[in-house]
Amino acid sequence: MAKAIYVKFDVPKELADKAAEALEIARETGKVSKGTNEVTKAVERGVAQLVLIAEDVEPAEIVAHLPLLAEEKEIPYIYIPTKDELGAAAGLNVGTASSAIVEAGDAEDLIKEIIEKVEELKK
């Protein structure tokens, strides 16, 4: 499958798994936004700490604005391979195109580690 238009860098599987784990921890001990509308609002308001975007969103235009918006607001973002994987990590029974960690809770150190690795990938 060709890479979607909004995917700007490749994320190693281990790092994507760590990001999904951080989302699960934040969901239980902090606060997360689920769905592209909620995520867009969290980014626009500058309250998102980390944005997670699924790589298999169809049509791509649903989330194509998120990387640009996140960069503009200086909020780190990462890609997760599938909507189903992202939805499960967000505590949903269905897939989701995007999710954001708003309050890290116990995932704070893990999020810092992920952000450092994402910055290296973007270089």
Swiss-Prot record:
Subunit details: Part of the 50S ribosomal subunit. Probably part of the RNase P complex.
Function as written in the Swiss-Prot or TrEMBL entry: Multifunctional RNA-binding protein that recognizes the K-turn motif in ribosomal RNA, the RNA component of RNase P, box H/ACA, box C/D and box C'/D' sRNAs.
GO cellular component: cytoplasm; ribonucleoprotein complex; ribosome
Single GO biological process annotation from the record: tRNA 5'-leader removal
Family from the record: Belongs to the eukaryotic ribosomal protein eL8 family.
Gene designation: rpl7ae
Compartments in which it is found: Cytoplasm
Family annotation (NCBIfam families): eL8_ribo
Alphabetic keyword roster: Cytoplasm, Ribonucleoprotein, Ribosomal protein, RNA-binding, rRNA-binding, tRNA processing
Pfam families attached to this UniProt entry: Ribosomal_L7Ae
Principal subcellular localisation of the protein: cytoplasm
Example of a GO MF term: ribonuclease P activity
Top-level taxonomy: Archaea, Methanobacteriati, Methanobacteriota, Methanomada group, Methanobacteria
UniProt KW Disulfide bond keyword: no
Protein name in the entry: Large ribosomal subunit protein eL8
InterPro entries in UniProt: eL8/uL1-like, Ribosomal_eL30-like_sf, Ribosomal_eL8/eL30/eS12/Gad45, Ribosomal_eL8/Nhp2, Ribosomal_eL8_arc
